[in-house]
Curated annotation (Swiss-Prot):
One Pfam family matching this protein: Ribosomal_S19
Record HAMAP family: Ribosomal_uS19 (MF_00531)
GO cellular-component term (any): cytoplasm
Species this chain originates from: Polynucleobacter necessarius subsp. necessarius (strain STIR1)
SUPFAM superfamilies in UniProt: Ribosomal protein S19 (SSF54570)
Gene Ontology terms, MF aspect: rRNA binding; structural constituent of ribosome
Function of the molecule: Protein S19 forms a complex with S13 that binds strongly to the 16S ribosomal RNA.
The name this protein goes by in its record: Small ribosomal subunit protein uS19
Length: 92
């Protein structure tokens, strides 16, 4: 079930404040956040946000296509190392 349209998108207030400060100062340093649940707003375009994935902060450069998605979608939490290779049995 999706979020109600009348409520609007959710974004952590602390993240919004950090974005406003970064835009006012024309700062290009990544903004560190643990808020994976925050929706990407149009104000975030052009900024780099370091999203926590449980171990480290993954830098995510926000583009126009990302608006409306959640920050957590772009910082993967699980590392896929591949499936085990098939062991071929040779007859003697």
């Amino acid at each position: 079930m999706t979020r109600s349209a009348k409520k609007g998108p959710f974004c952590d207030t602390s993240l919004v404040k950090k974005v406003e400060v970064a835009q006012a100062n024309k700062d290009k340093k990544p903004i560190k956040t643990w808020s994976r649940r925050s929706t990407i707003l149009p104000d975030f375009i052009g900024l780099t946000i370091a999203v926590h994935n449980g171990r480290q902060h993954v830098p995510v450069y926000v583009s126009e296509n990302m608006v409306g998605h959640k920050l957590g979608e772009f910082a993967l939490t699980r590392t896929f190392k591949g499936h085990a290779a098939d062991k071929k049995v040779t007859k003697k």
